Curated annotation (Swiss-Prot):
The modification N6-carboxylysine is found at residue 203. It catalyses: 2 (2R)-3-phosphoglycerate + 2 H(+) = D-ribulose 1,5-bisphosphate + CO2 + H2O; D-ribulose 1,5-bisphosphate + O2 = 2-phosphoglycolate + (2R)-3-phosphoglycerate + 2 H(+). One of its GO terms (molecular function) is monooxygenase activity. One of its GO terms (biological process) is reductive pentose-phosphate cycle. This is Ribulose bisphosphate carboxylase large chain 2. Belongs to the RuBisCO large chain family. Type I subfamily. The active site is at 177 (proton acceptor), 295 (proton acceptor).
Length: 485
């Protein structure tokens, strides 16, 4: 890599024509980021023959003020301040041809409290830039002064636990299955059985909205009837995530208002509604004392590939600022993408007060979250009672463990499946609190608990050996990929 020289002679710098991005001032290897800068780390793969520093400068330019040619109107602005500055480029370990590119952006480039504006700048244009074979946004750092322009989660972990009166353990949930095709009445029956058996939550899946087989209003009515009956039967606060995702904001508000009228404690939206809609629903949830659950539907289209797209750790940061209370963040042991360390990094982003640099977990920047409330991570997708020790060891207490098929697919029925999960959870938490090594003793702890719980014994017999131990595509560049098997 050759250290380029910025053209400082005004006449030459603004002469009509084309200059390299580094020469225009989008590279500064001596730049020291300010406390008020927004920082971004990109993984870039330059085209053959393209100098990595020039590629980094192009990323900085195209994500801030540059265009392909010199424009004299730059001189009408404080262009030296507004130009993003690539300030460090280093090879990605064990990935020839890939480079980590650090870029600093002046805070005044961004609108306060707008994730839509952040994304339009940082990922809006540069990812289709021809000099790059591929680009991926790996991490970001936001100054606390900018973080404070966002309201963040409307409820947060602490208040949610107070409303539920449930402490000292993970929360339990399940997604109603099959997620499409049930009538409203049968859907409500599934919800009742799951909650009566010991779950804290049931939930809609990402693509259940309002279809010919079940209108959204029917679903809400039958589900809330089931929630109320299960709460009365168990003496516990129960809930079911009512998906209010719709084609317009007006319709989403209408569905959310109806959920509130029925007494729901929680509503749900999908990531695909977009960041402006997410922030709008977050404001509504805050004004109406409602927990807001976020399903990350669609994220894998741009988070999964290691060399191109956006890391989910960045999405998690954006969503914490945008203001969601629950966020699907991976299981590490289930059927969906994510190795243990990388997924733990996502959880830390959701739950930390101050996130520290942690390269094995993919965290490249310190992040002060100011007074933003914490997001409750959700582990969902291909998990079952036999993995309870792994889940608690990996993620601790502040997590929702959602067993969809692992509840509804139980050989003795839905209520038995819920009971199996609740007993497995209670047994594991008790063993941990007594000082036992649940990571290594977990299988035996579960077998001992199953001696007095037929549903748990059946669950272990059915799924005890089921794993999804495939190699993840998105792993740390700094440590070998660990296994949970």
């Amino acid at each position: 890599m050759n250290e380029p020289t910025q053209i400082t002679d005004t006449k030459k710098r603004y002469a009509a024509g084309v200059l390299k991005y580094a020469q225009m001032g989008y590279w500064n290897g001596d730049y020291v980021p300010k406390d008020t800068d927004i920082l971004a780390l990109f993984r870039i793969t330059p085209q053959d023959g393209v100098d990595p520093i020039e590629a980094a400068a192009a990323v900085a330019g195209e994500s801030s003020t540059a265009t392909w040619t010199v424009v004299w109107t730059d001189r009408l602005t404080a262009c030296d301040m507004y130009r993003a500055k690539a300030y460090k480029v280093e090879p990605v370990p064990n990935n020839p041809g890939q480079y980590f590119c650090y870029v600093a952006y002046d805070l005044s480039l961004f609108e306060e409290g707008s994730i839509a504006n952040v994304t339009a700048s940082i990922i809006g244009n540069v990812f289709s830039f021809k000099p790059l074979k591929a680009a991926r946004l790996e991490d970001m750092k936001f100054p606390v002064s900018y973080v404070k322009t966002f309201a963040g989660p409307p409820t947060g972990i602490v208040v949610e636990r107070e409303r539920l009166d449930k402490f000292g353990r993970p929360l339990l949930g399940a997604t109603t299955k099959p997620k499409l095709g049930l009538s409203g009445r049968n859907y409500g029956r599934v919800v009742y059985e799951g909650l009566k058996g010991g779950l804290d939550f049931m939930k809609d899946d990402e693509n259940i909205n309002s279809q010919p087989f079940m209108h959204w209003r029917d679903r809400f009515l039958f589900v809330m009837d089931a929630v109320n009956k299960a709460s009365a039967a168990t003496g516990e606060v129960k809930g079911s995530y009512l998906n209010v995702t719709a084609g317009t904001m007006e319709e989403m508000y209408r569905r959310a208002e109806f959920a509130k009228e029925l007494g729901s404690v929680i509503i749900m939206i999908d990531l695909v509604v977009g960041y402006t809609a997410i922030q709008s629903m977050s404001n509504w949830a805050r004004q109406n004392d409602m927990v807001l659950h976020m399903h990350r539907a669609g994220h894998g289209t741009y988070t999964r590939q290691k060399n191109h797209g956006v890391s989910f750790r960045v999405i998690a940061k954006w969503l914490r600022m945008a203001g969601v209370d629950h966020l699907h963040t991976g299981t590490a042991v289930g059927k969906l993408e994510g190795d243990p360390l990388t997924v733990q990094g996502y959880y830390n982003v959701c739950r930390d007060t101050h996130t520290k640099v942690d390269l094995p977990r993919g965290i490249f920047f310190d992040q002060d979250w100011g007074a933003l409330k914490k997001v409750m991570p959700v582990a969902s997708g291909g998990i079952h009672a036999g993995q309870m020790h792994q889940l608690i060891d990996l993620f601790g207490d502040d997590v929702v463990l959602q067993f969809g098929g692992g509840t509804i697919g139980h050989p003795q029925g839905i209520q038995a499946g819920a009971t199996a999960n609740r007993v497995a959870l209670e047994a594991m938490v008790l063993a941990r609190n007594e000082g036992r090594d649940i990571k290594n003793e977990g299988p035996q702890i579960l077998r001992d608990a199953a001696k007095s719980c037929t549903p748990l014994a059946a669950a272990l017999d059915t799924w005890g050996d089921i794993t999804f131990n495939y190699t993840s595509t998105d792993t740390s560049d700094y440590v070998p990929t660990p296994s949970v098997a």
